[in-house]
Amino acid sequence: LYTDTVEEERYSVLKDFFESHIEQDKFNKLKDGYVVLDSKSNVCFFKKLTLDRFLKKHASRTFATTAEALRMLKCRRTDYKEGEKNVWYVEMPEFVNHQSIRKTIDKNEKSEMDESYHDRFRPTKTKEPSQKDN
């Protein structure tokens, strides 16, 4: 149970952090406080100061220190990346892609666009006995 909670918290913090700071393959933006996603390896790079500022604004109750956050989020440090020194990185979790979720519609399934769907809500028409002229 504890492991699940830790993983959920890790996922949540990383998702919020990446969504608010991410740039793709623009490593010159590291110094400007962005998280840079290497699209080939699905690894995100960032400066410790960027994470520190994010934690102070959004996740101060979750982690006591930035070092604790780096450890729990399973971040690693590299001395040098694309011209920047002391860069941290973490593999980006698979986030839900909102565009890829589409409900497949069965051709035989009725929808609100079909007349037959609305027929069930309409009062039934009773046939009145026809009067014949004699």
Question: Where do the PLM segments sit?
Answer:
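DNA transaction DNA-binding modules
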Residues: 1-134
